[in-house]
């Protein structure tokens, strides 16, 4: 298939992109926007007022950014995660109402400019935005930031094959087409938000509520990773796998695309401690560092933080641990200032892609969010799986038992706490054992397959070409 390039077009096509306002959802869609922008499309990223306050730029290397109100009181804008944890159902209700009203106004404003928007790519967790797009005469593209395997489970939840709440799944075992046999603990979990679990589960299942009306269905995955499930879903809807949507510069691919992302300024919309952590990693030998991060939303208990910190110290390995500022008070007393400095570095955030690509990183202790999973896979880094909620539990199952690129911890007490002994054992399995060598070989294999998918002629490359062509000639 020939390369689609509309840079020389006198009137570029205008694409709107609206990710759910969380880092793990914004970044993958932003990276897809980068690829589309490199083909000459005009891109406008829509985000919320509170998100815009936390980003480092209002224009990302040629991608315009527009903000809309969150729908929550202004004084709580900086505490969006806390608001979600307290009453997720109320948050989503307010956000939905605000997003529908203000996205409509924004599209109407942008339609008066040249070029007017033609398509709205939106996060699949916001299916109600499709109606806004169609009412305003735009095409709608649903972008799934989770694997097809997890999406298939949510679809079966919507169909009633899996009953809500998930805790009532019969015998705790689920058998679904083209998926491994799943225990109850492998199903997408929402236990972290106990008071909101049913509301969240329904929200996730609703991703498929109007999928038959969507003009495009885009998945941040690649064919080789989940070929049977991709084919099954493709028999129902015209899906396009376009992942991994990590920056193509990390694969050292197309020069034009790499130049477009030169300096990596486009890779991160949010501020990162690049200099501090990269200098620290440069001082470590190859495969000696455990990178630890549990994402932008997951919240560990104080007891769990204690178990993780003790396991890291007892492993006698170097470690780089990302702990969000609002979570720091859960660390053991003086851990960041004294104990950890002997072997580790604790920071609030970091350039995760650069960290995972660094030669000193031996493994990744992760919550198994899909964004982090793909970034580790693309970097050829084995994982220690410590899932918290939502799709992470299923991702962990796939990482350990299907793709065989990681080991999973056991929640060994009644409170779901992972003990330090179990974490230590996982660290030693990945870093010191023969199994660890096998995990590394598998990780490198999947890294190469991911590179093939986004390279010219690969499945995801061709699907992005197909999407681009459709917009050009539709």
Curated annotation (Swiss-Prot):
The keyword Glycosyltransferase applies. UDP-alpha-D-glucose binds at residues 296, 349-350, 367-375, 389-392. SUPFAM superfamilies: UDP-Glycosyltransferase/glycogen phosphorylase (SSF53756). Transmembrane segments: none annotated. GO terms for molecular function: quercetin 3-O-glucosyltransferase activity; quercetin 7-O-glucosyltransferase activity. It is an enzyme of class 2 (transferase). Keywords: Glycosyltransferase, Transferase. Its EC number is 2.4.1.-. PANTHER family: GLUCOSYL/GLUCURONOSYL TRANSFERASES (PTHR11926), UDP-GLYCOSYLTRANSFERASE 74E1-RELATED (PTHR11926:SF1560). Belongs to the UDP-glycosyltransferase family. This is UDP glycosyltransferase 9. It comes from Catharanthus roseus (Madagascar periwinkle).
């Amino acid at each position: 298939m020939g390369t689609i390039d509309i840079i020389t077009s006198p009137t570029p096509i205008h694409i709107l992109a609206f990710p759910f306002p969380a880092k793990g959802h914004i970044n993958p869609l932003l990276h897809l926007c980068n690829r589309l922008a490199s083909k000459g499309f005009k891109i406008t990223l829509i985000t919320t007022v509170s998100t815009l306050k936390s980003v480092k730029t209002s224009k990302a290397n040629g991608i315009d950014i527009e903000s809309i109100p969150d729908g929550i009181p202004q004084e709580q804008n900086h505490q969006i995660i806390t608001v979600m944890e307290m009453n997720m159902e109320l948050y989503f209700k307010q956000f939905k109402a605000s997003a529908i009203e203000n996205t409509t106004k924004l599209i109407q404003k942008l339609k008066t400019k040249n070029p007017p928007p033609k398509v709205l790519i939106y996060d699949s967790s916001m299916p109600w935005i499709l109606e806004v797009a169609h009412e305003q005469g735009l095409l709608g593209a649903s972008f799934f930031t989770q694997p097809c395997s997890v999406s298939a489970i949510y679809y079966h939840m919507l169909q009633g094959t899996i009953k809500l709440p998930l805790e009532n799944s019969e015998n705790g075992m689920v058998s679904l087409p083209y998926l491994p046999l799943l225990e109850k603990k492998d199903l997408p979990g929402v236990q972290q938000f106990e008071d909101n679990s049913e509301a969240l589960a329904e929200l996730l299942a609703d991703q498929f509520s109007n999928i038959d009306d969507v003009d495009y269905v885009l998945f941040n995955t690649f064919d080789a990773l989940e070929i049977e499930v991709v084919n099954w879903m493709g028999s129902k809807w015209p899906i396009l796998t376009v992942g991994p949507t990590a920056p193509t510069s990390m694969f050292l691919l197309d020069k034009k695309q790499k130049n477009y992302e030169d300096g990596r300024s486009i890779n991160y919309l949010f501020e990162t401690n690049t200099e501090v952590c990269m200098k620290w990693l440069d001082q470590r030998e190859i495969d000696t560092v455990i990178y630890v991060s549990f994402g932008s939303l997951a919240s560990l208990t104080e007891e769990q933080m204690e178990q993780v910190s003790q396991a890291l110290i007892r492993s006698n390995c170097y470690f780089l641990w990302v702990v969000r500022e609002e979570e720091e008070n859960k660390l053991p007393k003086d851990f960041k200032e004294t104990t950890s400095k002997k072997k580790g570095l604790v920071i609030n955030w970091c350039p995760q892609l650069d960290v995972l690509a660094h030669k000193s990183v031996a493994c990744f202790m992760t919550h198994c969010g899909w964004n982090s999973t793909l970034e580790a896979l693309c970097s050829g880094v084995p994982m220690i799986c410590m899932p918290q909620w939502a799709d992470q539990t299923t991702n962990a199952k796939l990482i350990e038992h299907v793709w065989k690129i990681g080991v999973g911890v056991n929640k060994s007490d009644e409170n779901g706490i992972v003990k330090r002994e179990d974490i230590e054992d996982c660290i030693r399995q990945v870093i010191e054992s023969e199994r660890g060598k096998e995990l590394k070989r598998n990780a490198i294999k999947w890294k190469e397959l991911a590179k093939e998918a986004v390279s010219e002629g690969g499945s995801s490359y061709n699907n992005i070409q197909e999407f681009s062509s459709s917009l050009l000639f539709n």
